[in-house]
């Protein structure tokens, strides 16, 4: 019968941090390690995992995004993801800007109108520019542990300067003051949002590394809480981007023409996880095609 030691005991034995020990366990690098009552138990005879080859552990996408962002390189993956993620995420929420208009705003910081009779909503333009800034923030802080303050910061970036921000009861960068619904379903009440969000983040951060399915599951729980008055979908998808980059997982884009499958998956997660996971995996295939085109190595 196996004898087990605690994470702390393994950390002392291997001369590494407790976080590193938990990370080894999460990644399956400690054979026969057991997760019980929120804690990892390590076989007493387990040996310290060897260090991964730097090439295997390298986050090529995040590295490229940061390089292209820093030097404002156009026509690369940073350029591509900024436009496609922003266009599709905003369009899901009702933005009327076209893909070309979104691209034009990103490239020139001006709005191109196809004719003198064309009009656009000011909020659509502001939220598009703000979404570009929010993606930049995600890239900069991708490796940080997810926190309430960061989530609130994303909301503040997204909604600053919009007509919503001028409403006395609309809390930009803070949790909602009025009850709301999503898809006709009730969400967490304003009085309970603080506690629910703290629990959601605390539970999620029990692990250092997360799988694709765990990131999607977090998204479902976040959207059901619906912590902000508006902008929850976009903030939620920005969190997905951050966590995929942090965990060296190819991110995904929910295309506007797949939004009904996306909504169906969110609504029916408890009954059938496969619907949402398949939609997200389809969106991941879209991004993988981008990475193949730009010659960026990723873990399949």
Q: For each predicted feature, which ranges?
A:
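FIC/Doc superfamily catalytic core
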Residues: 1-14, 18-30, 35-38, 44-300
């Amino acid at each position: 019968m196996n004898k087990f030691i605690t994470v702390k005991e393994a950390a002392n034995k291997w001369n590494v941090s407790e976080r590193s020990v938990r990370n080894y366990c999460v990644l399956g690098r400690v054979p026969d390690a057991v997760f019980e009552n929120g804690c990892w138990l390590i076989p007493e005879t387990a040996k310290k995992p060897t260090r991964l080859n730097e090439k295997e552990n390298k986050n090529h996408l995040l590295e490229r995004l940061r390089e292209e962002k820093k030097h404002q390189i156009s026509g690369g993956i940073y350029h591509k993801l900024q436009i496609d993620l922003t266009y599709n995420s905003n369009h899901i929420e009702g933005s009327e800007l076209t893909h070309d208009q979104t691209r034009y705003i990103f490239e020139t910081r001006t709005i191109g109108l196809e004719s003198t009779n064309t009009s656009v909503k000011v909020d659509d333009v502001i939220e598009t520019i703000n979404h570009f800034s929010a993606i930049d923030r995600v890239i900069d802080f991708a490796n940080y542990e997810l926190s309430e303050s960061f989530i609130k910061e994303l909301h503040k970036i997204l909604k600053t300067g919009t007509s919503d921000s001028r409403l006395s009861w609309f809390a930009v960068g803070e949790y909602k003051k009025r009850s709301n619904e999503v898809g006709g379903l009730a969400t967490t009440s304003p009085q309970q949002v603080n506690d629910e969000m703290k629990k959601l983040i605390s539970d999620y951060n029990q692990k250092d590394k997360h799988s694709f399915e765990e990131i999607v599951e977090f998204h479902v729980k976040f959207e059901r809480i619906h912590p902000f008055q508006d902008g929850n979908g976009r903030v939620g998808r920005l969190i997905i981007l951050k966590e995929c980059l942090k965990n060296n997982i190819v991110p995904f884009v929910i295309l506007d023409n797949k939004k009904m499958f996306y909504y169906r998956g969110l609504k029916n997660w408890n009954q059938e996880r496969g619907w949402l996971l398949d939609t997200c995996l389809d969106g991941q295939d879209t991004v993988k095609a981008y990475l193949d085109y730009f010659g960026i190595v990723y873990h399949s």
